[in-house]
Amino acid sequence: QLWATGHFM
C-alpha cells in the first residue's frame, strides 16, 4: 500500500 511505503521508508 502507498501509506506503507512512507511508513517503512
UniProtKB/Swiss-Prot annotation:
Location(s) in or outside the cell: Secreted
UniProt keyword terms in alphabetical order: Amidation, Amphibian defense peptide, Pyrrolidone carboxylic acid, Secreted
Modified residues (Pyrrolidone carboxylic acid): Q1
Tissue specificity field: Expressed by the skin glands.
Residues that bear Methionine amide: M9
GO terms under biological process: defense response; neuropeptide signaling pathway
Disulphide bridges, residue numbers: none
GO cellular component: a single term: extracellular region
UniProt cross-references to Pfam families, sorted A to Z: Bombesin (PF02044)
Transmembrane region(s): none
InterPro entries for this protein: Bombesin
Family: Belongs to the bombesin/neuromedin-B/ranatensin family.
Protein name: Rhodei-litorin
Native source organism of the sequence: Pithecopus rohdei (Rohde's leaf frog)
